[in-house]
């Protein structure tokens, strides 16, 4: 067996249909489009019209809805953060903006740090959520966790603290997120 003897499986490759190239080809004249009407013309065809058949959008039931208050949470493990530290990509302080840049996640609402992996050096991480194991490992390495909230209302809702207390606690840090200007 050599390269010149290789052939595709029998019946797997067909010649291209050259439509509208004369009646002798079997696909000439109307080129397989039938006679006249919207579907014989070039361009867009109405996809929903199925003739007398009940269309698919009526055969299938309605279900679900799109939540307007849906928030996206991007997770990141300590393993990844440790790799960034070793490579010198980040300093010993990580903020929400750093996560957005490094993970290419500008559309993410929240970041959650998970505990997979180990942290060997003290690091200060600002994120919206931390798993218990991640908090413990960061504290054990001599680091600090700061919970970032986008609004005071979020600080109260998530932590269940009165606003004054929330502002006094070291764990709560307000982060202003600039909305991107729409580009034309």
From Swiss-Prot:
What GO MF annotations does this protein's record show? rRNA binding; structural constituent of ribosome
Q: Which GO terms describe its biological process?
A: translation
Pfam families from the UniProt entry: Ribosomal_L27A
One term under GO cellular component: cytosolic large ribosomal subunit
- Presence of the UniProt keyword Phosphoprotein in the record: no
- Where does this protein have compositionally biased stretches of type Gly residues? 21-35
What keywords appear on the UniProt entry? Ribonucleoprotein, Ribosomal protein, RNA-binding, rRNA-binding
What domain of life does the UniProt record list for this protein's source?
Answer: Bacteria
Gene3D superfamilies registered for this protein in UniProt:
3.100.10.10
Map out region (Disordered) in residue numbers: 1-45
Q: Which family does it belong to?
A: Belongs to the universal ribosomal protein uL15 family.
The family database entries (HAMAP family) matched by this protein are listed as:
Ribosomal_uL15 (MF_01341)
* Role noted for this protein: Binds to the 23S rRNA.
* Quaternary structure note: Part of the 50S ribosomal subunit.
Q: What is this protein called?
A: Large ribosomal subunit protein uL15
**Organism in which the protein naturally occurs:** Chlorobium chlorochromatii (strain CaD3)
């Amino acid at each position: 067996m050599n390269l010149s003897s290789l052939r595709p499986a029998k019946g797997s490759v067909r010649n291209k249909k050259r439509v509208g190239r004369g009646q002798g080809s079997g696909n000439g004249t109307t080129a397989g489009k039938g006679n006249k009407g919207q579907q014989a013309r070039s361009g867009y065809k109405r996809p929903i019209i199925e003739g007398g058949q009940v269309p698919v959008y009526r055969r299938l039931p309605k279900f679900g809805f799109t939540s307007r208050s849906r928030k996206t949470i991007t997770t990141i493990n300590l393993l990844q953060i440790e790799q960034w530290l070793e490579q010198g990509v980040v300093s010993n302080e990580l903020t929400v903006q750093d996560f957005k840049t490094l993970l290419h996640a500008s559309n993410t609402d929240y970041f959650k740090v998970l505990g997979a992996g180990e942290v060997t050096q003290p690091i200060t991480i600002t994120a919206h959520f931390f798993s218990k194991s991640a908090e413990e490992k960061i504290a054990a390495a001599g680091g600090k966790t700061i919970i970032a909230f986008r609004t005071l209302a979020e600080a109260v809702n998530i932590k269940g603290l009165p606003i004054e207390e929330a502002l006094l606690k070291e764990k709560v840090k307000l982060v202003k997120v600039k909305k991107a200007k729409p580009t034309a």
